[in-house]
């Protein structure tokens, strides 16, 4: 359900964006459910489960920087649908890789239909996004292709072993920029591109979008440790339990490699390597130690800087 824009947007802006976002939502739900009774349930599953719709909102917002007549036109609306379809497709694939039981408060697709069906459903949604983008012109098609490549490359860089000698923090930022920043950047660029805001504006909003993506993920790293389960709906330290080294842990490892890690940090890394994080008490202890260590504040500062 579409509510209001964040950050106390001016009423005049909301008056333009909200109806356009409602149109994007209607088109999105139509696109994910226009096949047949066999295909429609999995393809519509996550779209109907809701979501923030950050990417189409950004497309609609940056379109306001160009021709106001084009800013809520057919191409901009279809671009909003395409970026959200692409995002949703990656969620199907992510949940298979992560073996996630839930997504957006609903059972994940592979939990309901199995891994093969979930992967193919993601592929179908990418194909449908590509069909929409094909009508937006060659520049939009190329941008979508390059972005999807970056999404996949980011996932591969996260999945495969990091090359020896690679700075862990720099490597992680690259992963975040590819996995999350690239699609948000394209979402911002599409609005400016299709409303003919000009090349300079396209470049600015694209860079802005990528920085938002990296900052969002860094903030999520903080939230994973600093918030409570009542607020987020998940156990603090979930990433740690899944074996994911997020920024606070990477900062510890980098300091250790440089011979600059304090005793508290060394104790945390030791606990991570030897403790059973499936044990709630052990996980809670590691989370409590990380909350007190300066790396958490440093990660928060990095998110603000980005």
Predicted segments with their positions:
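All-alpha prenyltransferase/terpene-synthase fold signal
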Residues: 1-306
